[in-house]
Design a protein with these regions (language model features):
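Conserved short alpha-helical segments that host acidic/polar catalytic motifs at enzyme active sites
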Residues: 1-226, 231-296, 301, 389
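A conserved beta-strand->alpha-helix junction
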Residues: 55, 129-134, 320-331, 428-446
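Amphipathic alpha-helical
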Residues: 134-150, 302, 310-332
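Phosphate/diphosphate-binding loops
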Residues: 158, 211-212, 216-220, 227-228, ...
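Extended, hydrophobic alpha-helical segments in both membrane/secreted and soluble proteins
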Residues: 298-301, 305-312, 316, 320, ...
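Short, glycine/charge-rich flexible loops or terminal/linker lids adjacent to PRPP-binding catalytic cores
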Residues: 314-362, 373, 400-410
């Protein structure tokens, strides 16, 4: 899961891209990068770490240009390392840079095809580099000295035919401008906004979430539709066209559960309101299963579950309290690359307030239970703080299946609910009672925000994958490639480390 930004402005855009990336930091903490274009030359700065650590004032001063793209990365395809920081770049044709959020499920096939048929070299194991080279090759086939918007749209139409999976991308083409596109299923989010400069010039931004627009005063004007492509020329003219044959709006439901910020709008759905509805639906299930629940207090696991927890407590008519204090300098445990890092992080990240636990029946609320690492330790912390009984509620259904569209849930045997009943999960995490949201209720909570959606990508809950190329062989291959043990081994060997091949300048 990653954060994307693309901008075309009246003046240098690097500072606004930086600000937007800080608003998307929750989507990826492994690496960050910005690439801009000025007078036909591309400039870049990228590296491992948080946005604030990768960029310094001397770097920003070198990132000149009125259009550019930015990326905050969390690795889902390929290992971690400086060589995989985005954007990626190819010099032919034109000079193209691209940043990508999602996962190509036919990446291995495309890699072979690019080498054997398209005569293109790939330097990493990242599917983002694959996507860039497919796009570049399709533009090159058109043979234009400089592409027109209709050429961009033609190339992206073929990209949609060749590439399978869930993806949103922003790209810049030297001497042309900004390009953004989204997969035909609309799995990964991408929004577009505009801002009127003091001179009257209209400036444009595309981003993974609407909060990235807010920080620089951009007005949300809508979403990049499934299968759609947007071009903004260097002169600031916006073009958009549907490039897929049969697009359907089926966004990833886990964005609403966990990844997106609550103050974001995506696909016309308020994440905040959706999580409020999740809490209300969960309260109804609690009352169905335990009318005499005896709950004294509802306590959220910071931060994602706070909104659902407030709604849940209100509907139950019990107190809502902040029973855990969060260390703001520890990253999100779900998106930490290794299991050992996640385990170590929980107690560093959260500390209980004993007053809220002593001699009480406590209902802890979290957005979901993935590996069970966090909730098991938190339940133990609640008991140590004096809780009489510890109940646990998940605002999402049991996560039983791997995600193949850009969220790091790679290995089924690492998912605590895979192959287990709810009762078995309860015993494993040590709760006195465990309640999950029903899938039908979860989907209804999001659909209420936009009845026009065709459905939701919910494969982590039901095992039904939108793209037809997902079989047991594929799932086993990604389990082997992306399991925590394999990822640690690959990083230790430096599989994806080494020199970053790309642009080299003072940034």
């Amino acid at each position: 899961m990653c954060g994307l930004v693309g901008m075309v402005g009246e003046r240098d855009v690097a500072a606004d891209i930086y600000d937007a990336l800080t608003m998307l930091q929750h989507r990826g903490q492994d690496a960050a990068g910005i690439m801009t274009c000025s007078d036909g030359k591309l400039m870049q700065r990228k590296g491992e770490g948080l946005v604030r650590d990768v960029f310094r004032s001397n770097h920003m001063a070198q990132l000149l240009g009125r259009f550019g793209i930015g990326h905050a990365r969390y690795p889902t395809q390929g290992s971690s390392g400086a060589a995989l920081a985005q954007p990626f770049y190819v010099n032919s044709p034109y000079g193209i840079a691209l940043a990508h959020n999602g996962n190509l499920t036919n990446s291995a096939f495309l890699s072979d095809e690019l080498f054997q048929s398209d005569l293109r070299h790939l330097n990493t194991d990242s599917d983002s580099e694959v996507l860039l080279n497919v796009f570049a090759h399709e533009l090159h086939r058109l043979g234009k000295l400089m592409p027109l918007p209709e050429d961009i749209f033609t190339a992206i139409s073929t990209v949609h035919k060749r590439c399978e999976g869930g993806y949103a991308a922003v790209a810049l083409i030297a001497g042309f401008g900004l390009v953004a596109f989204r997969d035909p299923h609309g799995i990964r989010p991408l929004v577009v906004g505009q801002r009127v400069a003091p001179s009257g010039v209209v400036e444009y931004m595309v981003a993974s979430e609407s909060v990235a627009l807010d920080v620089s005063g951009y007005e949300l004007i809508g979403d990049v539709l499934p299968g759609e492509a947007i071009c903004v020329s260097e002169a600031g003219t916006l073009y958009r066209q549907q490039c897929a044959e049969n697009p359907k709006l089926t966004p990833c439901i886990f964005e609403h559960v966990y990844f997106a910020r609550p103050d974001s709008l995506m696909d016309s759905i308020s994440v905040y309101k959706t999580r409020m509805r999740q809490g209300a639906a969960l309260a109804k299930k609690v009352l169905r299963e335990r009318p005499q629940h005896g709950i004294d207090v509802v306590i959220p696991i910071p931060d994602t579950s706070r909104v659902a927890g407030q709604s849940l407590a209100y509907e139950l008519g019990v107190k809502f309290r902040e029973g855990f204090m969060k260390n703001r300098y520890i990253g999100r445990t779900f998106i930490m690359p290794g299991q050992s890092e996640r385990k170590k992080s929980v107690r560093q990240k959260l500390n209980p307030v004993p007053l809220e636990f002593q001699d009480k029946t406590v209902l802890l609320v979290d957005d979901s239970i993935v590996r069970g690492t966090t909730c098991g330790q938190i339940i133990q912390m609640a008991r140590e703080a004096g809780a009489k009984q510890v109940y646990f509620a998940s605002a999402a259904p049991p996560v039983r299946f791997p995600n193949v569209y850009g969220i790091d849930m790679p290995a089924a045997d690492e998912l605590i609910a895979h192959g287990r009943t709810v009762e078995e999960v309860r015993v494993e995490i040590g709760a006195d009672w465990l309640v999950y949201q029903d899938l039908e209720d979860l989907l209804a909570c999001s659909r209420e925000g936009n009845p026009a959606v065709d459905g939701f990508e919910s494969s982590v809950f039901d095992g039904e994958y939108l793209t037809g190329n997902i079989d047991e062989h594929y799932l086993q291959s990604i389990q082997a490639a992306r399991a925590d043990s394999a990822k640690r081994h690959g990083d230790a060997l430096g599989v994806s480390d080494g020199a970053v091949v790309g642009l080299h300048n003072d940034s």
